[in-house]
UniProtKB/Swiss-Prot annotation:
Keywords: Ribonucleoprotein, Ribosomal protein. GO terms for molecular function: structural constituent of ribosome. It holds the Pfam family Ribosomal_60s. It comes from the Archaea. It comes from Pyrococcus abyssi (strain GE5 / Orsay). GO terms for biological process: translational elongation. Forms part of the ribosomal stalk, playing a central role in the interaction of the ribosome with GTP-bound translation factors. The keyword Cell membrane does not apply. This is Large ribosomal subunit protein P1.
Length: 107
C-alpha cells in the first residue's frame, strides 16, 4: 500500500510518477524500496487518469446504502411462518379428530 500512497502523494503535489520520484518518497517515509514493485506500479499507472479513477472510486459509496431495505421484508416472513404454524395446528387437530372417529368405531 505504501507504493500506491506514494504515487497518490506525487500526483497530489503535481509531480511526475516515475521510478526515481517513487523511490525518493518511499525512502523519505522510511520504507525500503523494492525496485520490482516500483517498476510494476509505474508501468501499471502509465496512461491512467488518476483524477478520473479517484472520482469513479468515490461514487459507489453512495450506492452502498441501498441494501438497507432488506429488514422491511422480515414481517412478511413472520406472517408466512405464522400461517405455516396455523396450518400445522389445523392438521394436528384434523388428525386428532380422525383418531377420535376411529375409536368411536371400536366402542
Amino acid at each position: 500500500m505504501e507504493y500506491v500512497y506514494a504515487a497518490l502523494l506525487l500526483h497530489s503535489v503535481g509531480k511526475e510518477i516515475n521510478e526515481d520520484n517513487l523511490k525518493a518518497v518511499l525512502q523519505a517515509a522510511g520504507v525500503e524500496p523494492d525496485e520490482a514493485r516500483i517498476k510494476a506500479l509505474v508501468a501499471a499507472l502509465e496512461g491512467v487518469n488518476i483524477d478520473e479513477v479517484i472520482e469513479k472510486a468515490a461514487m459507489p459509496v453512495a450506492v452502498a446504502a441501498a441494501p438497507a431495505a432488506a429488514p422491511a421484508e422480515a414481517p412478511a416472513e413472520e406472517k408466512k411462518e405464522e400461517e405455516k404454524k396455523e396450518e400445522e395446528k389445523e392438521e394436528e387437530v384434523s388428525e386428532e379428530e380422525a383418531l377420535a372417529g376411529l375409536s368411536a368405531l371400536f366402542g
